[in-house]
């Protein structure tokens, strides 16, 4: 799951080397804290949150086969 998030976000940002993803594992929930360069923050979030919402939808669809819930948080 972490690799998929990283692959998607690296395709959006200008500075892919600045991406950090921390994973917190719960019983049925996976939380991913994504940190990107401040310049790329707007690209990841997108206009009115469309990009991050789309990323969350894709990741949640992939997590359904494992009966997991995924939360993606953008942190600074």
PLM feature segments, named:
Residues 1-43, 52-53, 57-76:
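RNA-contacting regions in translation and RNA-metabolism proteins
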């Amino acid at each position: 799951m972490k690799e998929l998030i990283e692959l998607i976000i690296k395709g959006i940002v200008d500075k892919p080397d600045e991406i950090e993803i921390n994973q917190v594992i719960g019983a049925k929930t996976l939380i991913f804290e994504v940190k990107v360069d401040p310049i790329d923050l707007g690209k990841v979030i997108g206009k009115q949150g469309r990009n991050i919402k789309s990323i969350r939808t894709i990741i949640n669809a992939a997590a359904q086969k494992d009966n997991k819930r995924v939360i993606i948080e953008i942190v600074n």
